Amino acid sequence: TSDRNEAFNALCNGIELDGKVLLEEFLFGEEASVLVVMDESGYVCLPASQDHKRLLDGDNGPNTGGMGAYAPAPIYTPAVEQRTISEIIEPMHHFLRNQDVPYRGCLYVGLMIDENGAPFVVEFNVRFGDPETQVTLPLISSDLGELLMSCANGKISECDYSISSYSSATIVLSSEGYPSNSITGRVINGTEIRI
């Protein structure tokens, strides 16, 4: 928040709950999401995407799970990609590979990329992100099932895969009241649009 009183009240409420508050540096920049399919043998980075979380046009309204996305994300340049791999993905892969139970699956890496092209981790999730997956998976030119089976069997390093040079976009249609009090069971009209 940019409201000092709101921030102060949140701080006081946190202290009252359990006496602990975690303060983090505010990150300025542009977000990007990278889906990494990995096992102990290696990993595959899918094209970076960017979702837009605000409910209303013009980046207004409350945050949502994502009202739309596109890939590839222009902010994720080859230089940013290289830094992300060497500074974030490689160390995380090394860490996970050396655990007693090696990780096999999708690692969602939420990034903030600053004005100098430095990537910072905002979040990790062990799942495919939504709506990012809707724009990323269509860009895989090879067999997705083969890629995922290779990962499940610990042989992703042996899997041949290719990524399309196309772009992809999605728009989310939501029910009235979303994201706080969605009205369910209604039909969302207007999905007959063809491009």
Role assignments for model-derived ranges:
Residues 1-134:
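Internal nucleotide-binding/catalytic subdomain
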